[in-house]
Swiss-Prot record:
Family designation: Belongs to the bacterial ribosomal protein bL35 family.
Organism whose genome encodes this protein: Chlorobium luteolum (strain DSM 273 / BCRC 81028 / 2530)
Pfam families (alphabetical): Ribosomal_L35p
Keywords: Ribonucleoprotein, Ribosomal protein
Name of the protein described by the UniProt record: Large ribosomal subunit protein bL35
Length: 65
């Protein structure tokens, strides 16, 4: 049986930390920022952790395959 390939789109969007959690970037933070206030744009540039356990298991399978 051949080796499992990792999902390249998921690898570009998610990163696994050393503790095993999944880090992701927030959406809506790349363009049309003049319509959003400064507090919101600052928050959108910060990365966050994935909090859905079932999605985390699926994404780990895609990234670490």
């Amino acid at each position: 049986m051949p080796k499992m390939k990792s999902h390249r789109g998921a690898c570009k969007r998610f990163k696994a930390t050393a503790s095993g959690k999944i880090k992701r970037e927030r959406m809506n933070g790349s363009h049309n920022l003049e319509k959003k206030n400064r507090k919101r744009t600052r928050r959108l540039h910060q990365s966050t952790m994935l909090d859905n356990a079932t999605k985390e298991k699926q994404i780990k399978r895609m990234i670490l395959a």
